[in-house]
């Protein structure tokens, strides 16, 4: 059984779920490099959605701005550049070797490590909260990483311990236009100053909320933070 078949067992796509069709040639032309075959199969199998109620993959031409691969490549790369300019802690990898591929509810990022830009099937995975400086490396492709995460077989320092108690699952995002528009309004507001989990935690404590140093930020706390800053 290959990794994709195992992932479909652990996190089955909903019955009748049909992801959007992708023009891979145009996507790769826009990014300037080829993409891994396993990622293409993931996108064609799942489309936009949530793995283990925590992690989402960026998608080509995604109607959700926060998940659009090209848009997030630009935005996250800009964050990497700013981080290099102001941080006392250097990045463990040059930005040119990091291709954003996903994010989490807590503001963590998933990257491909492009050790050879022309051989994408050999790319491995790096995960970071960026602001806290913690980086984790997974020596396998994206699908294998999702399998390991779903089986609790990999340790990612940026991820909350509560994820180990989370059942494997995949939940597709709604295609309702009004929900997409609402999400994009919030995404566009946040683009200029991307929210980091430590900023939310600090604000929450200053305003009387009880939040752990690590772990999933409660939904009511995140909503209160967003309401106070938008």
Enumerate the language-model features and the residues they cover.
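Compact, glycine/acidic-enriched structural inserts
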Residues: 129-155
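Low-complexity, glycine/alanine/valine/leucine- and proline-rich hydrophobic stretches
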Residues: 113-117, 128
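A surface-exposed partner-binding patch
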Residues: 1-108, 117, 177-182
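Short, Lys/Arg-enriched alpha-helical microdomains
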Residues: 213-230
């Amino acid at each position: 059984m290959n990794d994709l078949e195992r992932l479909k067992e652990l996190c089955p796509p909903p019955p009748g779920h049909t992801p959007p069709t992708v023009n891979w040639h145009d996507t790769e032309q826009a990014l300037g490099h080829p993409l891994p075959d396993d990622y293409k199969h993931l996108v064609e199998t799942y489309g936009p959605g949530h793995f283990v109620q925590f992690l989402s993959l960026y998608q080509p031409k995604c109607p959700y701005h926060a998940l659009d691969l090209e848009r997030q490549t630009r935005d996250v790369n800009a964050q990497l550049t700013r981080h290099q300019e102001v941080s006392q802690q250097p990045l463990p990898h040059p930005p040119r070797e990091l291709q954003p591929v996903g994010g989490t509810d807590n503001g963590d990022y998933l990257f491909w490590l492009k050790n050879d830009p022309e051989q994408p099937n050999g790319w491995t995975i790096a995960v970071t909260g960026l602001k806290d400086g913690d980086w984790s490396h997974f020596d396998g492709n994206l699908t294998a990483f999702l399998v390991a995460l779903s089986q609790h077989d990999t340790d990612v320092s940026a991820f909350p311990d509560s994820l180990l108690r989370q059942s494997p699952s995949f939940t597709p995002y709604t295609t309702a236009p009004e929900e997409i528009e609402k999400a994009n309004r919030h995404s566009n507001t946040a683009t200029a100053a991307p929210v980091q989990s430590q900023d939310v935690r600090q604000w929450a404590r200053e305003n009387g909320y009880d939040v752990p140093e690590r772990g999933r930020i409660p939904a009511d706390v995140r909503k209160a933070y967003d309401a106070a800053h938008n």
